[in-house]
Amino acid sequence: FLKMRSGRREQNIFNIGVRFDYYIVQKTPKHTTTVVIDHEDKSHILDLDKFNWLPNYAISEISNMLGNSCQVLYNTAYHTQHEHSDIQTGDFFNPVVHTINQKGIGIKYFKDKKTDIHFGVPKVLLNQNELQYPVNDFEGKYGMSQLTFGISIKTKEEGDKIVEFLNSDKGKRIIAATKWNTFYTDYNMFADFNKDWYVK
């Protein structure tokens, strides 16, 4: 048995709004299924061996998206601890996306032009923020800082569909349901999605 608590109604327990789970473990041979109650108080009977992580809710919807075939692009080659500039200059001219918010993208400029997963690579840019404001970088114009990651795409149309999905009510619900630690979006989650995860 596993009960997930959202933190919204539990302030009287710890005097702070914090998410937590509680569970009951029995000393018996392993069961194949576990009763899980999510943040929306919906009950599910799940084989937890089939999950690398559990969403806080929208479990059925997200289960249909799993499949380990979404290619995530992430490394820290353009970490902002490395030498960079806030403005484009003669030496610092390669644009690297550091932040993405409602106002658009925040750029840092670096000297080196890395082409492994950054420049020249078609991708949809996402950020480790709580909320997502996806950017279709099909032309591979941008590198990514330690706060930004990419979803590999093959066509501009595929990127447009991913952006459309993540901006939809369903996409926002999926993103909101997959917050664990400090409400940031974990790029590892996308690696567990199937190739058609964004198809509504």
Outline where the language-model segments fall.
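C-terminal substrate-recognition regions of SAM-dependent nucleic acid methyltransferases
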Residues: R9-K200
